[in-house]
Amino acid sequence: MKIWCAVCDKEEASVFCCADEAALCNGCDRHVHFANKLAGKHLRFSLTSPTFKDAPLCDICGERRALLFCQEDRAILCRECDIPIHQANEHTKKHNRFLLTGVKISASPSAYPRASNSNSAAAFGRAKTRPKSVSSEVPSSASNEVFTSSSSTTTSNCYYGIEENYHHVSDSGSGSGCTGSISEYLMETLPGWRVEDLLEHPSCVSYEDNIITNNNNSESYRVYDGSSQFHHQGFWDHKPFS
């Protein structure tokens, strides 16, 4: 006696799935449980068909091969013992009895390869490999034009001239044009302010000279020179650090 597949009903079942509560053949098992990762985690037990010698014996007589299983009596019965027991009265006739196939189920779940995991890993590996972006590749000619342009060279010379002028060590002709253009820009942005006072080092300025005059409004402002004194104007007092 065989157990047929619960899906196709054409082949003999080889595994039993506890989650699906169904017996499946090999083909239907691969089709159902290799579909996704969740289905691949279902516990499946192998089914083994017994030989004639391994067939179970009747629990009543213990001599003949058992063919039925009674759910209420919790016993396997042969044909000769089943008839007199379940035909005795109306209560025993209502017992649920099932055909006994003798198929044994394995004690531990079987290990099956998970094709879905390998496919997912391959897909993940393909997803991680991204093609190089065309926009990230900059032609060498364009990069040379950017870094060797005349404007960048002029700007670097201007900064170099300002640094030398700040430390009072600039040459006579070095960066004069750049310093003049920046001075004009500062005079236009901050009208009435002297650029020499802004570029002069704070340590070289005394307290009396540390006053910047606004020619337009005839107002004087005190600038903090980095010493240990506060220089304020108006209602604030001139006090040293405590």
UniProtKB/Swiss-Prot annotation:
GO terms for molecular function: DNA-binding transcription factor activity; transcription cis-regulatory region binding; zinc ion binding. Interacts with MED25 and COP1. InterPro entries: B-box_zinc_finger (IPR051979), CONSTANS-like_Bbox1 (IPR049808), Znf_B-box (IPR000315). Its main location: nucleus. Acts as a positive regulator of seedling photomorphogenesis. Plays a negative role in brassinosteroid responses. Zn(2+) 2 binds at C58, C61, C81, H91. Coiled coil: none annotated. This is B-box zinc finger protein 20. Zn(2+) 1 binds at C5, C8, C28, H33. PROSITE patterns: ZF_BBOX. Residues 133-153 have a biased composition (Low complexity). COP1-mediated ubiquitination and subsequent proteasomal degradation of BBX20 occurs in the dark. Keywords: Metal-binding, Nucleus, Repeat, Transcription, Transcription regulation, Ubl conjugation, Zinc, Zinc-finger. CDD domains: Bbox1_BBX-like (cd19821). One of its GO terms (cellular component) is nucleus. GO terms for biological process: negative regulation of brassinosteroid mediated signaling pathway; positive regulation of photomorphogenesis; regulation of DNA-templated transcription; response to brassinosteroid. The keyword NAD does not apply. A zinc finger (B box-type) spans 5-47, 58-100. Residues 112-153 are annotated as: Disordered. It is found in: Nucleus.
